[in-house]
Amino acid sequence: MSKYMGGKEASSVLGVHQRTLYQWDKKGWIKTIRTKGGKRLYDVGSYLADKDEESKEDHKLSICYVRVSSNNQKDDLERQIKFMKKKYPNHTIIKDISSGINMNRKGLNKIIDLAIEGRVKEVVVAYKDRLARFGFSLIERLIEKYSDGKIVVVRKKENQEPQEELMEDMMDVMNVFIARRNGLKKYSNK
């Protein structure tokens, strides 16, 4: 939206002095055109649209997501939080204590809701599996599509072959089912 105005009107709309508009023009912060008589006309519409877009970007969240599988790993959770706060001091920390296979986690659901609302700038995780054992690419796609955001993985596993990755995923699934079976056994014996 281009709406050019003279200096007096533009300064009134933007709430700045005409001299400030002149400085902004010199710095290239606001578009201007010159009339044949040499008078400056300021593109206030584009300037306001750009500022509005910048303010929308300022309302997006940068998030560090940390997760452990059980309450027995709270020390590891605290280490993850400490590491993330040190490396990303301006990010919001969201944490979960739940299995990586469980997609119904309070913290993960909060991230997905924020992404759908368009409020996620980036999500930082230590490893991909901290966010999700399965469905990582789906969560990544949601964040990219709805928030124009990204996921940053701090520690990537080096050059892992697809077969190794598949084997690791299968072991994770088996561990979950074994733990669940053992948990059920424990309660059936009581």
Swiss-Prot record:
Organism: Acanthamoeba polyphaga mimivirus
DNA-binding region: 11-30
Active site location: 69
The Resolvase/invertase-type recombinase catalytic domain, residue ranges: 61-190
Organism lineage: Viruses, Varidnaviria, Bamfordvirae, Nucleocytoviricota, Megaviricetes
GO biological process, alphabetically ordered: DNA integration; regulation of DNA-templated transcription
Keyword set, alphabetical order: Coiled coil, DNA integration, DNA recombination, DNA-binding
Family: Belongs to the site-specific recombinase resolvase family.
PROSITE patterns given in the database record: RECOMBINASES_1, RECOMBINASES_3
Function noted in UniProt: Resolvase catalyzes the resolution (a site-specific recombination) of the cointegrated replicon to yield the final transposition products.
GO molecular function, one term: DNA strand exchange activity
Pfam families from the UniProt entry: MerR, Resolvase
Protein name as catalogued: Putative resolvase R771
Coiled coil: 66-92
